[in-house]
Amino acid sequence: MNPPKSAPDAQGLSYRDAGVDIDAGDALVDKIKPFAKKTLRDGVLGGIGGFGALFEVPKKYREPVLVSGTDGVGTKLKLAFHLNKHDTVGQDLVAMSVNDILVQGAEPLFFLDYFACGRLDVETAATVVKGIATGCELAGCALIGGETAEMPSMYPDGEYDLAGFAVGAVEKSKIIDGSTIAEGDVVLGLASSGIHSNGFSLVRKIIERANPDLSADFHGRSLADALMAPTRIYVKPLLALMEKIAVKGMAHITGGGLVENIPRVLRDGLTAELDQHAWPLPPLFQWLQQHGGVADAEMHRVFNCGIGMAVIVSAADADDALRQLADAGEQVWKIGTVRASREGEAQTVVV
């Protein structure tokens, strides 16, 4: 029997030769530990680096229900790569999940992230994770763990993908599911910070067509900064509102815009009628509509059009809710009312 052929003169291979740099991964962990530490809150048991992250549900909950959400940043990342701007997409990642679980009344407790790339650039990854930690601080949740996956040939150099996972808790008796929404209720709209993290495939197509100077001034900042403005996190002002006022329903205005997200919290037979003149269309959306020739109906089903969160309360509570949110620093408008649906009508209409 012949022995297996070998190459005695060839140098032995290492994981680094295959494209995975374990030392870079270790260096990243060292860089991000201080960011994660700033997000620690009551309930965290242990620190980053264990096989699993431990969290004790706060004792203030008598019948806690856990609420989970997961999301990404979508093709906004392609614009981040083009601009070499990585400091805000981490906040986007957190916002997409914590705002989603917030609408059911949940207080975000902890967050985990997944960062995938072909070749790990420690500085870029650390910048992204610093943004994630900033988002967690704004949401009051702990960055409790994550995964960095360096996968040679899976992604081009300089590119990466992100996913985030948020878990929160709500008292079982205080779950917000839209079941109490009734005719005559008022829809409040909280201002977005910009495009947030949806519709960027269309945004990039408009940029391709218009070929603008992204460094040019756009209402006091560069057009690039306006396009990349991080998604607003509504957690703290809305949790405070829920302590004082009976919030009947909330909708995070993400993919599908106003007309496809508000119906997710409405019972059959109800329609939210929104007045498009009740709030100003921000200049960035005007620019996108003008340079893309985008129809009004398409704008309303792709973009948030200046409204990042819709909150539904009774007519009797509407003024108090407006006042409290404004005092908390939110821009907010009465943007519509709830009424009985007409035959064959959509559950959200913009007039």
UniProtKB/Swiss-Prot annotation:
Q: What is its EC number?
A: 6.3.3.1
Q: Name one GO molecular function term.
A: phosphoribosylamine-glycine ligase activity
Which EC class is the enzyme in?
ligase
Q: Subcellular localization, per the record?
A: Cytoplasm
Q: Which family does it belong to?
A: Belongs to the AIR synthase family.
Please tell me one Gene Ontology term that the record gives under cellular component.
Answer: cytosol
* InterPro entries (alphabetical): PurM-like_C_dom, PurM-like_C_sf, PurM-like_N, PurM-like_N_sf, PurM_cligase
> In which pathway is this protein known to take part?
Purine metabolism; IMP biosynthesis via de novo pathway; 5-amino-1-(5-phospho-D-ribosyl)imidazole from N(2)-formyl-N(1)-(5-phospho-D-ribosyl)glycinamide: step 2/2
GO BP field: 'de novo' IMP biosynthetic process; adenine biosynthetic process
Q: What is this protein called?
A: Phosphoribosylformylglycinamidine cyclo-ligase
Reactions catalysed, semicolon-separated, are: 2-formamido-N(1)-(5-O-phospho-beta-D-ribosyl)acetamidine + ATP = 5-amino-1-(5-phospho-beta-D-ribosyl)imidazole + ADP + phosphate + H(+)
The record's annotation in HAMAP family points to: AIRS
The protein's UniProt keywords, in alphabetical order, are:
ATP-binding, Cytoplasm, Ligase, Nucleotide-binding, Purine biosynthesis
Q: Which gene encodes it?
A: purM
Organism equals Burkholderia pseudomallei (strain 668)
Pfam families xref list: AIRS, AIRS_C
Domain of life (superkingdom): Bacteria
